[in-house]
A protein has these predicted regions:
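Enzymes that bind and transform nitrogen-containing heteroaromatic metabolites
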Residues: 1-149
Length: 149
């Protein structure tokens, strides 16, 4: 997200950060990516060496992808996801729904204000900083954990 919480503009990510993409690939390889239909369409295909789950109320089957109607349809035992980490990959509506269910949050902060039409929801009351994983002049990647209740 940018300094003003933007995560998207016209169904695209409004920045290009190859180092962030490399980190994302390393972190998610071998695990499960859960995303909304529009996010999947912006990527265009399943990412290699990961299980891709697309949440959509309207999409039919997509080759190489598990399509489910919503978050409540995800059952790791029934969907063959047991033992894998689930990564929520957007978009804004899915982040809003999933944040209360997440134990950890890995967040890229782009160190500038960006124009856009999709925003990351507030998370600061629910999560606390666990670790700064990467910090460079353009962006920072932070790991947050859900606060104890």
């Amino acid at each position: 997200m940018s300094l003003n919480r933007v995560i998207g503009a016209g169904n695209k990510i409004p920045w290009h950060l190859p180092e962030d993409f490399r980190w994302f690939k390393q972190m998610t390889t071998g695990h499960v990516l859960i995303m909304g239909r529009k996010t999947f369409e912006s990527i265009g295909k399943p990412l290699p060496n990961r299980i891709t789950v697309v949440l959509s109320r309207s999409a039919n089957s997509i080759p190489g992808v598990q399509v489910l109607p919503g978050l409540d349809s995800i059952n790791p035992k029934a969907n063959g996801l047991a033992g894998r980490t689930l990564f929520i990959c957007g978009g804004a509506e899915l982040y809003e729904q999933a944040l209360p269910l997440c134990s950890d949050l890995y967040l890229t902060l782009v160190k500038r204000v960006v124009e856009g039409d999709r925003f990351f929801p507030p998370f600061e009351e629910r999560f606390e900083l666990a670790e700064e994983m990467l910090d460079n002049p353009q962006f920072r990647i932070s790991h947050y954990r859900q606060k104890s209740r």
